[in-house]
Amino acid sequence: VTCRNHFPRDPKTCILQKTYTITDIVMDEHGRLKKLLLEKSYREGTFNLSSGKTSNFYVDGKQTTLSAEGAYLCGRLLYRLIRDHHENITGVGGMTLGADPLVTAVSIVSYLEDAPIPAFIVRKEPKGHGTDNYIEGKNNLQPGALVAVVEDVVTTGGTLVKVIDRVQSEGFRVGLVATVVDRQEGGAEALESRGYPLVSIFTRQQLIG
């Protein structure tokens, strides 16, 4: 079996000069995603955030999550976070646009892992025509499904709170909230106060020190 990018997707089936463990693979993926985020997404300057705050740095997550390697790595690492923290999750979704590539990547990875998790996307407003849906993909979920809600970058948690409220109004249950980058500006605390601990691939401290 030939493995791309110098690491095995499945260490049981890949024959390489080096013997890899699951820990080796996770650390390699984690390091590669950090490098991509710093190269493609991290910027310094003066920025207005969606939360209304002003910041001296900005993480434009979509520059990474819409790249082929970035989408793959985010999908792998978010899938692992979801499974490690809540093995009974049966759906993954988030607010358009930031979550769109993430939920797609996680769903594809889950299929490759033979444990498929359908994706869904929460609109900011109803579609306005056709089915007039707020949530696209909900027909792939069972009534009352336990789902994970994801976002690329979390600041105050306001977007995630809106998603959670919308998901619950449709009869689904939120079992986990996850992000690629937690800016550590109150989002985790806001979510935890509502009973939803936030898990992340990187905190601001881990990403930029």
Language-model regions, residue ranges each:
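PRPP-dependent phosphoribosyltransferase catalytic core
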Residues: 24-36, 164-209
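Active-site-facing substrate-recognition patch
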Residues: 25-86
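Phosphate/pyrophosphate-binding loops at sites that engage ATP/ADP/AMP, CoA/4′-phosphopantetheine
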Residues: 78-89, 164, 168-170
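Short glycine-rich phosphate-binding loop at a beta-alpha junction
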Residues: 87-98, 178
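Short, glycine/charge-rich flexible loops or terminal/linker lids adjacent to PRPP-binding catalytic cores
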Residues: 103-148, 158-161
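Acidic, divalent-metal-coordinating active-site segment for phosphoryl/phosphodiester hydrolysis
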Residues: 151-164, 186
